[in-house]
């Protein structure tokens, strides 16, 4: 039989930043907002890292890709 664990810590649920701030349209020109969803190397973070919903993650990725095409955000950020 499986034993139950006692104690431990419960992981806090991540909050969707876009839904929490009631942002309906993710604008590609808002690079400050989009930089929250990009790693320091310039890669788009998977939705489990920032905790965004699937619907808002799709909005974020299309906005980031548009910003990259318009040269507002870099494709690769090398330090």
Swiss-Prot record:
Part of the 30S ribosomal subunit. Forms a tight heterodimer with protein bS6. Belongs to the bacterial ribosomal protein bS18 family. This is Small ribosomal subunit protein bS18. GO terms for biological process: translation. InterPro entries: Ribosomal_bS18 (IPR001648), Ribosomal_bS18_CS (IPR018275), Ribosomal_bS18_sf (IPR036870). It holds the Pfam family Ribosomal_S18. It comes from Streptococcus pyogenes serotype M49 (strain NZ131). Keywords: Ribonucleoprotein, Ribosomal protein, RNA-binding, rRNA-binding.
